[in-house]
Amino acid sequence: ENGISPRAVWQFRSMIQCTIPNSKPYLEFNDYGCYCGLGGSGTPVDELDACCQVHDNCYTQAKELSSCRFLVDNPYTESYKFSCSGTEVTCSDKNNACEAFICNCDRNAAICFSKAPYNPENKNLDSKRKCA
């Protein structure tokens, strides 16, 4: 437990379930490749892993926004409003500047995940060897 609010991670999870119905985001996307899950280093191993790298970088940018200063270094703690229609995610225009930015980070990642092939061999990768 490193300060990540279950509610905000749960929102990202719901978003992924919107763009990829019947997916199990925690099981499938956590600890995948070099960037999916906590932390990240090296070169992404595939398209899905690259989605996670972009998402990590997006969160890094969020932390630098003046509107996100109160986040205490963790965008996962910010909850935002969004809706799902079919497989289409829409971030609410009621979000403040920081929420809107993080919502878009998550939305873009969820869309990216839905277009990327899933390679089971990249799940639980030996990141010390493969992501140096």
Curated annotation (Swiss-Prot):
Its cofactor is Ca(2+). It catalyses: a 1,2-diacyl-sn-glycero-3-phosphocholine + H2O = a 1-acyl-sn-glycero-3-phosphocholine + a fatty acid + H(+); 1,2-ditetradecanoyl-sn-glycero-3-phosphocholine + H2O = 1-tetradecanoyl-sn-glycero-3-phosphocholine + tetradecanoate + H(+); 1,2-dihexadecanoyl-sn-glycero-3-phosphocholine + H2O = 1-hexadecanoyl-sn-glycero-3-phosphocholine + hexadecanoate + H(+); 1-hexadecanoyl-2-(9Z-octadecenoyl)-sn-glycero-3-phosphocholine + H2O = 1-hexadecanoyl-sn-glycero-3-phosphocholine + (9Z)-octadecenoate + H(+). Secretory calcium-dependent phospholipase A2 that primarily targets dietary phospholipids in the intestinal tract. Hydrolyzes the ester bond of the fatty acyl group attached at sn-2 position of phospholipids (phospholipase A2 activity) with preference for phosphatidylethanolamines and phosphatidylglycerols over phosphatidylcholines. May play a role in the biosynthesis of N-acyl ethanolamines that regulate energy metabolism and inflammation in the intestinal tract. Belongs to the phospholipase A2 family. Activated by trypsin cleavage in the duodenum. Can also be activated by thrombin or autocatalytically. Its main location: secreted. Ca(2+) binds at residues 35, 37, 39, 56. The gene is PLA2G1B. Monomer or homodimer. Gene3D superfamilies: Phospholipase A2 domain (1.20.90.10). This is Phospholipase A2. It is found in: Secreted. Binds 1 Ca(2+) ion per subunit. GO terms for molecular function: bile acid binding; calcium ion binding; calcium-dependent phospholipase A2 activity; phospholipid binding; signaling receptor binding. The lineage of its organism: Eukaryota, Metazoa, Chordata, Craniata, Vertebrata.
